């Protein structure tokens, strides 16, 4: 949890760098920076991602943000501004963390895809197909999920009704 731990607080960048060095020493070149506790904030995410992207250019990075405090989307945008391109998401925002009190799931796939679409960032993913899967997930679970897009719909749908 490089963005913050419920037990250790903020983790110094030097400790994170040491862990990354240890991974590289044994041949690991794909590394995920996870915010399972949902403690990360955009300026911290930007600074850390900029740092590791520059210091460790051979690493293939993944980012993993839980939306516990409602800032996962902003954290993704900050990471993208720092050059990161891969993010874990989940249908409907499912998930959680059994050892972090109150932890929400990952940010919903459809919310992130919609944000990218509306921002002109090509993902190659059909947001409506993802929404259909997330609706099926809700049906299977028997309750709503944390997807904003399933509640509000695509911006383009709203714009069509205004015209």
What do these predicted regions represent?
Residues 1-163:
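Catalytic cores and adjacent flexible loops of soluble metabolic enzymes
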